[in-house]
A protein has these predicted regions:
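Phosphate-binding loop of NTP-binding sites
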Residues: 19-22, 43, 57-58, 69, ...
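Glycine/charged-rich beta-loop-alpha catalytic/anionic-binding loops adjacent to active sites
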Residues: 101-104, 243, 267-277, 323-328
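ATP-dependent carboxylate-amine ligase
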Residues: 1-38, 43-49, 61, 65, ...
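Fold-independent oxyanion-binding glycine-rich loops
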Residues: 8, 30-31, 52-53, 68-70, ...
Length: 460
């Protein structure tokens, strides 16, 4: 089968393209914005990419068009598909019908930590010899690819609550039918499609409704919103993490060396295993608890899973070191929600000690562009010594609010820019040896990471 994917460079659709290719299909695709690591991954798979959504792409005559949720009515190619009554489906529906239907699906849902937790879970199963298939919204460094199809009975998937397509407004995860589902956390996000937290809770309850009675829900026991979801109705076994009577970290963290930590995991009163790894922060320990509990559901002993986490390498764009120049380290992170920004900076502060942190932020997610959470930005940036914000001056990524005003509570610590080159000059001029620069965006950010490294190197 030849499938042509509209919106192929999104993290989900790009992974789906890889799965389709590995299943033996001919895959082509198009998108408006192409940037690493997804573009690199697709090209390595031999998938042809086409820039833009020109209507003449129907001349490729694929057997099926697979539509990403970035596509809306008015898109030239989509309009041509509709006018000609050509066959099309959504990405999640195609995945559910062609890949997941005969698998034991382990799904990871939640506002934050989905990508990291999915990667942890896939790695635990891999290290245990389960050879799982997976689809992750990033590139796990243990695998070097965001998606893989195997002949294993098990498939691990990052389960996103964003809507499926313009013609199917249900959350993507209702198509996955997991037997094991992690509900990692839940707070308001995606303000472009959800009016409030209650609307998101409804979608999460739809997910709960799809888990079979013999399945299991792994739930963050600290989250009131998730408890509200369960009170609407639950027909599956529930295990909680982050609370004393469930999976929890029972002993204080032990600092082994710079950038490393160890902690004991308990399941209720019983010690379940010790994790020694290079990750930092309470959020990653919570992610680990969820992954260990889910892996236990398919038969991996917790002590074995804990040992596997000692070999876990985090996902690209999750505090990924992009380079060092002039004594300054530059990190790349996907954080774009105030909670994620705060968590990222808190983790870096713990690692960096008294070293200066320079936060470089592009608030370009749909929620951030609407300004719904702009008032939370200053507090989320509290651990940064200097803040450099960027707002595109025009186009689809431009902000509907004033970034300078939003950052004003930070005083002289914060500056806002509308051009990337000016931003690079300012950051480079401010940086000192020993500083830690963390770039936070859910997009390519104009290749700013390499521009910063080049500017710092030229200054040295």
């Amino acid at each position: 089968m030849h499938i042509h994917i509209l919106g192929i460079c999104g993290t989900f659709m790009g992974g789906l393209a890889v799965l389709a290719r590995q299943a033996g299909h001919t895959v082509t695709g198009c998108d408006a914005n192409v940037y690493p690591p997804m573009s690199t991954q697709l090209e390595a798979q031999g998938i042809r990419l086409i820039e833009g959504f020109d209507a003449n792409q129907v001349s490729l005559e694929p057997d099926l068009f697979v539509i990403g949720n970035v596509v809306s009515r008015g898109n030239p190619l989509m309009e041509e598909i509709l006018n000609r009554n050509l066959p099309y489906t959504s990405g999640p529906q195609w995945l559910g019908e062609h890949v997941l239907s005969k698998k034991w699906v382990l799904a990871v849902a939640g506002t934050h930590g989905k990508t990291t937790t999915t990667s942890m879970l896939a790695w635990i199963l891999e290290d245990a010899g389960y050879n799982p298939g997976f689809l992750v919204g990033g590139v796990p460094m243990n695998f070097g690819i965001s998606a893989r199809l195997t002949d294993s009975d098990f498939f691990v998937i990052e389960a996103d609550e964003y809507d499926t397509a313009f013609f199917d407004k249900r959350s993507k995860f209702v198509h996955y039918h997991p037997r094991t589902a992690i509900l990692n956390n839940l707070e308001f996000d995606h303000a472009d499609i959800f009016p409030d937290l209650t609307a998101i809770e409804t979608q999460f309850h739809h997910l709960v409704r799809t888990v079979p009675g013999q399945g299991r829900l792994i739930v963050n026991g600290r989250e009131p919103a998730l408890e509200r979801v369960l009170t609407r109705g639950c027909w599956s076994e529930v295990e909680r993490f982050g609370v004393a009577d469930g999976w929890h970290v029972a002993e204080a963290n032990e600092t082994l060396a710079a950038g490393q930590e160890a902690f004991w995991v308990h399941q209720g009163p019983k010690a379940a295993g010790e994790v020694k790894w290079a990750l930092q922060g309470e959020h990653n320990r919570m992610n680990a608890l969820a992954a260990l509990a889910a892996a236990r559901h398919v038969g991996v002993p917790p002590e074995q899973g804990a040992a596997s986490l000692g070999k876990f390498q985090n996902v690209k764009r999750r505090m990924e070191v992009r380079g060092e120049a002039a004594g300054v380290t530059v990190y790349d992170d996907f954080a774009h929600h105030p909670t994620a920004i705060q968590t990222t900076l808190a983790g870096l502060r713990r690692r960096a000690g008294k070293a200066r942190i320079l936060a470089v932020l592009e608030p370009r997610s749909n929620t951030m562009k609407l300004g719904v959470m702009k008032a939370q930005l200053p507090a989320s940036l509290a651990d940064a010594d200097l803040v450099f914000g960027y707002g595109a001056p025009s186009g689809k990524d431009s902000l509907g609010w004033n970034l300078t005003e939003a950052l004003a509570p930070l005083g002289v610590r914060a500056q806002a820019f509308s051009d990337i080159d000016g931003l690079v000059r300012a950051v480079s001029a401010a940086a000192q040896p020993g500083d830690q620069i963390v770039v936070m965006s859910n997009g390519g950010f104009g290749g700013i990471h390499q521009k910063l490294l080049d500017a710092l190197a030229a200054r040295a």
